[in-house]
Amino acid sequence: MVLNMESTGEAVRSTTGNDGGITVVRSDAPSDFHVAQRSESSNQSPTSVTPPPPQPSSHHTAPPPLQISTVTTTTTTAAMEGISGGLMKKKRGRPRKYGPDGTVVALSPKPISSAPAPSHLPPPSSHVIDFSASEKRSKVKPTNSFNRTKYHHQVENLGEWAPCSVGGNFTPHIITVNTGEDVTMKIISFSQQGPRSICVLSANGVISSVTLRQPDSSGGTLTYEGRFEILSLSGSFMPNDSGGTRSRTGGMSVSLASPDGRVVGGGLAGLLVAASPVQVVVGSFLAGTDHQDQKPKKNKHDFMLSSPTAAIPISSAADHRTIHSVSSLPVNNNTWQTSLASDPRNKHTDINVNVT
């Protein structure tokens, strides 16, 4: 048995020999008598290194265990790193493009709409910057959206140039022609009922007699009699004002099929008698000139000089609209004050309003 006395620096060895004596070894004895100290901690790892034997000193005090000091230092360092990482203040402003060593900083591949960052901190050596929490999300415009105001303005301009393309003033009509009546005269009489222009779209029925214009330049006509099925009927009649007399200009063309399969057609030059009830589809619209005449003309604003006016109180808010409409008229600056004073419509009326 060996006893280590720290106060005196002496080691006592008990031997169980024949004499049963006790040998006392002092600190200045040879190294064969020294024994390594035992650690008091019971949970040491089996791979721990045994510290070297204590060196003799003047005070004969043993140094603290080396293993315990190492474990304490490692634990303290880890704790300090955790505290410094948790209390690190997040920097604001634009992130750096280059790192301290001059290398380009890699951006985070995460999108802006990703989930919040995890609770654990990245390793100190990584240079990954996350913009999900620092930058604001910008408004994303849908791909199928467009400027409706600009589109509406373009349509209005197109209507001024070609009103028929917009289709807002186009009205369809159906004309029924009884047996024995002239289809041409029926359409012309319908077009004379108003100032609108007429276009013939289609027709169906049977014709008993038709007069067509010859295609040559002689100006002759051809008349066909029998039963002919209407294949197509088209034309237009436009209003015309010449010398104060309102008239119609235009014409129609027709294609007919005979019972034996022959097809005849051309420009109508006379009667188109119906052999059965005939339905004609026409459309009425305003021509380009009529459309521009009926549009309200915009008043051109002339520049005028006017003296500054005083502020108008709330009690005379009703009179403010009258003064504003009169002041916007292009009148002379010299007679502006006189016209306002002489006009009885511009008299101010005192209105008392109790505001609670």
From Swiss-Prot:
Short motif Nuclear localization signal, span: 295-302
Keyword DNA-binding on entry: yes
Listed Low complexity bias regions: 106-118
UniProt biased composition (Pro residues): 49-66
Domain PPC: 167-309
Family annotation (CDD domains): DUF296
Keyword Nucleus: yes
Region (Required for nuclear localization): 270-287
A GO CC term assigned to this protein in UniProt: mitochondrion
DNA-binding region location: 89-101
Transmembrane segments: none
Positions occupied by motif Bipartite nuclear localization signal: 89-97
Described function: Transcription factor that specifically binds AT-rich DNA sequences related to the nuclear matrix attachment regions (MARs). May play a function in the positioning of chromatin fibers within the nucleus.
Name of the protein in question: AT-hook motif nuclear-localized protein 1
Organism: Arabidopsis thaliana
Gene name in the database record: AHL1
